[in-house]
Amino acid sequence: MTAAEEHGERAFAADLARAPAIIAARGLGLGAPLVVTEETASTNDDAKRGARHGSPHGATWLAESQTAGRGRQGRVWISPRGDNLLFSVLLRLGCPPARVPPLSLVCGLAVRDAVAKALGPAHDADVVVKWPNDVLVRGKKVAGILVESALSGAKVEYVIAGIGINVLGRSLPDELSAVATSIALEGGVDLDRAVVLADVLAGLERDVALAAERGLGLVHARLSKHDALAGRAVESTDSPLRGTGCGIDLEGRLLVRTADGTVTKVTAGELRLRPVTAAREG
């Protein structure tokens, strides 16, 4: 290990620079072209600019560092240089606007599968999708997805799937250590970021276009199997709703059964797991 590597400044050419060759060897349509930069404000913003200037379906923007990366509801995405995967994929799907919100779950499945592969078969059940856009390992966030889109008439002109995966980091700020993790911290067996990237792109290529055309039906069983909130006591962070997660419907809505047996379909917002004591009381 070089002095630079010891300080987290991994050589770009030795790691992510292999990604185009791996993507090409797998014959993937997504990830080509792959635009790689050391630092950018936001890969989603880069992808939007590319979309407006005619970049093709599958074009992907990847950065070692983001200065203005964000998640849902404008949250800042913290990512030390060289530790993680930060990328955005341009998807020209031509689907109705109603098909866009569930795509964050489809992207979540692709990320989940790639993370589970990197951790090894023994950890497959530990990696789950948390509605609407997170991937967790043993209850801690390892990845997040931000899906954005633009309309052209009644159709979606393009979708941007922005993805951040904590891969190599072995330490986290104190305020995050209880709620976040990385593939490395969970004992990952394959820490090659280029391989993880290609695995995610392969999953997106397999599922996203079909989901945009036909809905969640083809992935619903897998989504149900890896649903982080199923059977768990949950509460909304921005409304009085509290109850038990009881699945995700074919429209991508979270189903929550309240104490009186009513099932509420949640289309937007954020839910968190309730503490065990609170769940027993409520």
Predicted regions and their residues:
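N-terminal lobe of the biotin/lipoate ligase/transferase fold
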Residues: M1-G120, V276-G282
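Long, positively charged amphipathic alpha-helical accessory segments at protein N-termini or as interdomain linkers
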Residues: T2-F12, P97-D126, V137-G282
